[in-house]
């Protein structure tokens, strides 16, 4: 449970139903109304955070589902009520710190501390089994050779994985890695050679510290040189992602057929290549009903944490802190649905997956083996994905695992099926470049891609 806050009496008042009584903590709000400017907001943020912590201290939160859900709402309310995106970084950092402490106190981490007590594995070379990321994903992949196959695989997978919330991502080439653009750019800067080039020797893939340092530099430029200083960290990063700048975000959709459209999208360069459709679990398979309730509460808290001016994960500067919030453990993938400031977001049912670079230790690595027992190296896994991606079969119900790693699923779409699937998606759902990219950027790309056909069709 939570530590006693300095100056606070142990425990706290609760009502007869076991919920926290927050009446005695209303004074910070009253004081805020009497004050003015950023100092008042700073005091309110700090006092409210402490009030919430004190109120929940007596509760055995991991066993009380309503309390867990209430904490998520409280966290969101704190951020919403104080108009926090307009606060200075220092003030917002204090409020964010309070919420991080709240999450830690609630003991919501799904991963086991013992799995990350050992020193993280050093960089490694590729194993002989990996000639491309596609080799890693192929071990458990489903094969789609027609629209009928696609329907069956999606229906079977969503039925088998009912207890796991899924998001979807389509990629035009089955041999591409599941990498964020920031991870990919940093890997190139650090001199990583992809497995397709058959390199010999250790591969220095980016660490979480590398990612954080790059993000800090990018945010500094955005706020100091371009003066985008009033946006939250997540909104800044999301807008940069939309404009093609490198970020740690992975574009996903909550609609499997939209993801399939991205996988089979017409492309002179990739039409002859197999495509890949990913289904990413955002939480582990729950081991108990209580764990399933915790998944819901964790999602609510995750939403609140994405509202900070500074990225909350920048404060997680040790392995222990990252494990406490399941950052880079594979046990939690934050899914952020951005505001609909862009027409593509609604059209694509879009969201972003957010997670830390995997923390590979010897104890965790044992969960990453091929179906024939082959052990994948750290380089193999990072060459394949910038987040934990433990693959499962689409034909069986995914079991819970000791490390509480969220499941991932892979579907290979044969190149010969791309045209049929593309035509059926347009006929059944109206998916086309015009509907998926309903803006001038999409129009420009379409004209560039289909210029000859457009001119040939005439006015």
For the regions a protein language model found, what residue spans apply to each?
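Catalytic-core elements of nucleic-acid end-processing and repair enzymes
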Residues: 2-9, 26-33, 39-459
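Extracellular calcium-associated, cysteine-rich motifs in secreted modular proteins
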Residues: 12-25
């Amino acid at each position: 449970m939570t530590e006693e806050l300095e100056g606070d009496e142990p425990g706290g008042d609760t009502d007869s139903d076991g919920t926290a009584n927050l009446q005695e903590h209303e004074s910070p709000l009253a004081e805020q109304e009497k004050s003015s400017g950023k100092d008042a907001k700073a005091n309110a943020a700090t006092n409210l955070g402490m009030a919430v912590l004190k109120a929940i201290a007596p509760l055995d939160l991991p066993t009380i589902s309503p309390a867990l859900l209430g904490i998520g709402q409280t966290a969101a309310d704190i951020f919403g009520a104080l108009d926090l995106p307009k606060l200075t970084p220092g003030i917002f950092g204090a409020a964010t710190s309070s919420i991080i402490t709240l999450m830690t106190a609630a003991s919501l981490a799904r991963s086991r501390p013992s799995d990350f007590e050992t020193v993280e594995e050093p960089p490694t070379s590729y194993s002989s089994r990996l000639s491309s990321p596609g080799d890693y994903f192929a071990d458990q992949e489903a094969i789609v050779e027609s629209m009928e196959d696609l329907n069956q695989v999606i229906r079977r997978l969503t039925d088998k994985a009912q207890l796991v919330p899924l998001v979807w991502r389509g990629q035009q080439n089955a041999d591409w890695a599941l990498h964020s653009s920031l991870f990919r750019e940093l890997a190139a800067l650090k001199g990583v050679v992809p497995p397709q080039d058959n390199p010999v020797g250790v591969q220095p893939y980016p660490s979480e510290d590398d990612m954080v340092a790059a993000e800090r530099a990018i945010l500094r430029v955005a706020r100091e040189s371009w003066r985008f200083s009033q946006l939250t960290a997540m909104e800044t990063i999301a807008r940069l992602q939309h404009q093609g700048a490198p970020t740690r975000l992975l574009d996903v959709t909550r609609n499997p057929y939209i993801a399939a459209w991205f996988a089979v999208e017409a492309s002179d360069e990739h039409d002859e290549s197999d495509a890949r459709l990913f289904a990413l679990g955002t939480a582990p398979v729950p081991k108990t009903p209580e764990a399933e309730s915790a998944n819901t509460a964790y999602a609510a808290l995750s939403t609140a944490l994405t509202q900070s001016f500074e990225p909350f994960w920048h404060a997680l500067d040790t392995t222990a802190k990252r494990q406490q919030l399941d950052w880079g453990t594979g046990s939690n993938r934050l899914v952020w649905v951005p505001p609909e400031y862009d027409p593509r977001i609604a059209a694509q049912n879009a969201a972003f997956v957010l997670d830390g670079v995997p923390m590979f230790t010897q104890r965790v690595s044992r969960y990453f083996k091929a179906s024939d027992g082959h052990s994948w190296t750290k380089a193999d896994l990072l060459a394949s994905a910038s987040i934990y991606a433990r693959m499962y079969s689409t034909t069986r119900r995914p079991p819970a695992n000791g490390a509480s790693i969220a499941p991932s699923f892979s579907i290979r779409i044969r190149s010969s099926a791309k045209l049929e699937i593309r035509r059926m998606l347009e006929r059944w759902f109206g998916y086309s470049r015009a509907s998926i990219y309903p803006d001038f950027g999409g129009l420009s790309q379409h004209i560039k891609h289909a210029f000859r056909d457009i001119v040939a069709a005439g006015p």
